[in-house]
Amino acid sequence: MKSKISEYTEKEFLEFVEDIYTNNKKKFPTEESHIQAVLEFKKLTEHPSGSDLLYYPNENREDSPAGVVKEVKEWRASKGLPGFKAG
């Protein structure tokens, strides 16, 4: 797994978020592996809302993996943090 969000393309990160959202059993066969993915999401995004982005969406955004990625991308840009790698 990649250690920084800047190592992901936006598409790769969206796929990661989709796998968490759907609890993809091929990617996360156990509850523990799913929990670890959620914790990795929190670490990668550095967003103050953490996993709440996944489970308690802001009323002003789409409740979907794409909405999560958009919010993370916009928040990181507003804080001057690195974004996704080109690709």
UniProtKB/Swiss-Prot annotation:
Q: Name one GO molecular function term.
A: toxic substance binding
Its BP terms in the Gene Ontology are: bacteriocin immunity
Alphabetically ordered keywords of this record: Bacteriocin immunity
- Tagged with keyword Ubl conjugation: no
Q: Does the keyword Oxidoreductase apply?
A: no
The Swiss-Prot or TrEMBL record describes its family as follows: Belongs to the colicins ColE2/ColE8/ColE9 and pyocins S1/S2 family.
Protein's UniProt name: Pyocin-S1 immunity protein
